[in-house]
Structures are given as C-alpha cells and as structure tokens.
Design a protein with these regions (language model features):
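N-proximal low-complexity "stem/linker" segments adjacent to membrane-targeting elements
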Residues: 1-25
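Conserved donor NDP-sugar-binding/catalytic core segment of glycosyltransferases
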Residues: 98-129
C-alpha cells in the first residue's frame, strides 16, 4: 500500500479544521500522512491541530514564521512530503471515507499520473447544497486554459511519475496554475466519475469572489503561462463564458 501525503494549508480554520481532519481519519485507505501547514493563524486552529497530532502520529503540523499565503503553505508541505502520491485537501473541505482507496486504485490500475474526481458543495453547516458537480472524463493543457475543471480538494498526483511539482507563488488561482504546470508534463488529467469530496462554499471563502478570481486568471495567462496577448484574450473570453454558464446552472 503506497503512502499518500495529504497537503493541507491552514489559516484561521478553527471552525472547520476538526471536521476536515476527521474526514481523513475515517479513510478506508490507512497508509497516509497529513501535513498541515499553518500560515500564522491568530485563532485556536493550532491548538485543535496539535490535539490531533498527539492522538495520531500520521498528522503533522508545521507553523510558518511569517504569513505567506496558501501557495507557500502548500509548497512547504509538498517539500516535507514522504509519500509517492500527493493529495490536496483544504482546511474547510471534506473527503468521503472511500476517497483515497478508490482514487489510488483508479490511478494504479490505469497507469494514471494525475487524477481528480467529481464532488458536491456543502455550506458552513456541512449540509449538501448542490447536486453532484460532474467533470470531464479527461482534460489536457489547452482545454484547461479555457476553464479550471479540476477542483483542488479532489486532486492526487503521482510523484514517482512526475517528481514533486510545486505551486507558483501567487495569491489566488495557484492551484489552477499548478494543474497547468502538471499538464505540461502529462497528456491528460483523468477524472474518477464519482463524488469523492465535499467542497465548502460560504461567504468569506477565497473562492466566493468570482470577479477577483477572473482577474487573477488573466494575470496567470500573461505572467505565469506567458501567453501572447491574442492567445490570452482567446482563452480569457472562453474562461468568462464557461464561468458564466456554470454560474447560471
């Protein structure tokens, strides 16, 4: 059974971190380590995390000296990771208990280096507020430029095939930038067509401001992906249209 390293950035996450950790502890796949990197929280997050660290040695806490943002937090955890498989779970999100077992088997049986899954949305009270969010069966680099089809909390990549791949140091859309970076190494990312995760959507979450997120996508195209103005405009128009269609749904 291969070791899975779970990458979890934490910042003022006292409301949700316990439930997040419990969803990992409930996994039917037991060979994992959870590396939680705290980005200078001022609430009781660390006390809660430390309590779990004492109960289970698979859970590790790293505290950053300076508030540095989620990309630095995730990269710090990736650097410390010992597992073959790198998985991502934010401190306010949850996994279903068969998540790792099903997705790792899917990757090993099909020789997949980069995978994701479908998911559902939950509110701040952990109540499901959406139907299953369906994803394409597979996506390549060019398709991903048109929309971020890959939710962070569902991703697992195989470091034995890809080596460790790190996030660009940007404030927002750093996960999107990482998926694009990985898709330059492999032909496709493949979807496990079953909801294996629960994405928490609430006012105050970084993902809730769509206009700001779109502006960061433009910045990603030009500064990270180095697209020409014409290509950036083409993909940005596609991104806005697809985002509008998803919003209307």
């Amino acid at each position: 059974m291969e070791l899975v390293s779970i990458i979890t950035p934490s910042y003022k996450s006292e409301r949700f971190i316990a439930e997040c950790i419990e969803s990992v502890l409930s996994q039917t796949y037991e060979n994992w380590e959870m590396i939680i990197v705290d980005d200078c929280s001022t609430d009781n997050s660390n006390e809660i995390i430390e309590m779990y660290c004492k109960k289970d040695a698979r859970i590790k806490l790293i505290q950053l000296e300076h508030n540095s943002g989620p990309a630095v937090a995730r990269n710090t955890a990736i650097k410390e990771a010992k597992g073959r498989f790198i998985a991502f779970l934010d401190a306010d999100d949850l996994w279903v208990k068969e998540k790792l077992q099903k997705q790792i088997a899917f990757m090993l049986e099909n020789d997949i280096a980069f995978s994701f899954s479908e998911y559902v949305k939950i509110d701040e009270h952990s109540q499901v507020i959406s139907e299953v969010i369906h994803r394409p069966k597979k996506v390549d680099y060019k398709r991903m430029l048109k929309s971020n089809y890959i939710p962070c909390l569902t991703v697992i990549y195989d470091s034995a095939k890809l080596s460790k791949v790190y996030m660009p140091l940007i404030l927002k859309r750093q996960d999107y930038a990482l998926w694009l970076r990985i898709l330059k190494k492999v032909d496709f990312a493949y979807c496990y067509n079953e909801p294996l995760a629960k994405y928490r959507f609430y006012s105050g979450s970084l993902s809730s401001n769509k206009f700001v997120a779109a502006m960061y996508v433009w910045k990603l195209y030009r500064e990270i992906e180095k697209l020409s103005l014409a290509k950036a405009l083409y993909y940005f128009v596609n991104y806005v249209i697809i985002s509008f269609i998803k919003y209307k749904k």
